[in-house]
UniProtKB/Swiss-Prot annotation:
Source organism (scientific name): Mus musculus
Name used for this protein in its record: Electron transfer flavoprotein subunit alpha, mitochondrial
Domain remark from Swiss-Prot or TrEMBL: Domain I shares an identical polypeptide fold with the beta subunit ETFB though there is no sequence similarity.
Subunit structure: Heterodimer composed of ETFA and ETFB. Identified in a complex that contains ETFA, ETFB and ETFRF1. Interaction with ETFRF1 promotes dissociation of the bound FAD and loss of electron transfer activity. Interacts with TASOR.
Source lineage: Eukaryota, Metazoa, Chordata, Craniata, Vertebrata
UniProt function note: Heterodimeric electron transfer flavoprotein that accepts electrons from several mitochondrial dehydrogenases, including acyl-CoA dehydrogenases, glutaryl-CoA and sarcosine dehydrogenase. It transfers the electrons to the main mitochondrial respiratory chain via ETF-ubiquinone oxidoreductase (ETF dehydrogenase). Required for normal mitochondrial fatty acid oxidation and normal amino acid metabolism.
Coiled-coil regions listed: none
Length: 333
């Protein structure tokens, strides 16, 4: 039996929806927007109400122009100051608090990247609210879904905080269209520099390969490769597929590759069109970081390896024979 909602309840629900407003904290490198920000904008749009983006930094005019064209963005707030160089959370937090105070945003969010995970807990603490981390679905403006137990279970969280602060798993939401929008831009509210930390320098490793979290194809290796030198087999294969190269935690802990290549619960979350797992047994922590991939191919000589339980295609064979053969076949095409 269904019971109709009282008119007063419907009016309150409509009122709440009408007054929803979300502030997306843009992650960027001054001249380019981080892809996860586009996924976060899509998530923010599902809350209903107006979506604004806050861009803080130095010489970030191009990012502002690009954001104004993104579908679903109503307003871009801009704060340019040397204090925001490097997007330090200590400096960004007072700016976000002042912006929220002036515009009364009901939601504040960012991508669940190192940037967002570093910033949002501080913002939430200052607002005296509990943040919701790494959401994968939005059921309503106050109800979110996130994974627990290394991705083996889903947890639905109802948030009754006055301001909802949450981070968004980029792989769970489509990227917002980068054209079709016509947002206005204006200066963000001013805030005083905290001055307790200073951005000194950043050294980035440049690679011709795609960035791991944004690649359409990922080739990952595990402890089965036996050494860091043997990862050259994966690099050669990845070159033919225009793929990024990742690794399991076991391979990282063994010192085969640096930890910025780690895929998994404590590493990077990926969801490419094609994921090739080479010499990876399939610990649940690794599966949590790649199980949403569209197609998974596993290569392992152990037919009982857990990775085969999630793989769409499995090759039970010696990787030192199979991978070079795959590379040679691709070279001939």
């Amino acid at each position: 039996m269904f019971r109709a909602a009282a008119p007063g309840q419907l009016r309150r629900a409509a009122s709440l929806l009408r007054f929803q407003s979300t502030l997306v904290i843009a992650e960027h490198a001054n001249d380019s927007l981080a892809p996860i920000t586009l996924n976060t904008i899509t998530a923010a749009g599902r809350l209903g109400g107006e979506v604004s983006c806050l861009v803080a930094g130095t010489k970030c005019d191009k990012v502002v122009q690009d954001l104004c064209k993104v579908a679903g963005v109503a307003k871009v707030l801009v704060a340019q100051h040397d204090a925001y160089k490097g997007l330090l959370p200590e400096e960004l937090t007072p700016l976000i608090l002042e912006t929220q105070k002036q515009f009364s945003y009901t939601h504040i969010c960012a991508g669940a990247s190192a940037f967002g995970k570093n910033l949002l807990p501080r913002v939430a603490a200052k607002l005296n609210v509990a943040p919701v981390s790494d959401i994968i679905e939005i059921k309503s403006p106050d109800t979110f879904v996130r994974t627990i137990y290394a991705g083996n279970a889903l947890c639905t969280v109802k948030c009754d905080e006055k301001v909802k602060v949450f981070s968004v798993r980029g792989t769970s939401f489509e990227a917002a269209a980068t054209s079709g929008g016509s947002a206005s831009s204006e200066k963000a509210p001013s805030s005083s520099s905290v001055g307790i930390s200073e951005w000194l320098d950043q050294k980035l490793t440049k690679s011709d390969r795609p960035e791991l979290t944004g690649a359409k194809v990922v080739v990952s290796g595990g402890r089965g490769l036996k050494s860091g030198e043997n990862f050259k087999l994966l690099y050669d294969l990845a070159d033919q597929l225009h793929a990024a190269v990742g690794a399991s935690r076991a391979a990282v802990d063994a010192g085969f590759v640096p930890n910025d290549m780690q895929v998994g619960q404590t590493g990077k979350i990926v969801a490419p069109e094609l994921y090739i797992a080479v010499g990876i047994s399939g610990a649940i922590q690794h599966l949590a970081g790649m199980k949403d991939s569209k197609t998974i191919v596993a290569i392992n000589k152990d037919p009982e390896a857990p990775i085969f339980q999630v793989a769409d295609y499995g090759i039970v064979a010696d990787l030192f024979k199979v991978v070079p053969e795959m590379t040679e076949i691709l070279k001939k095409k």
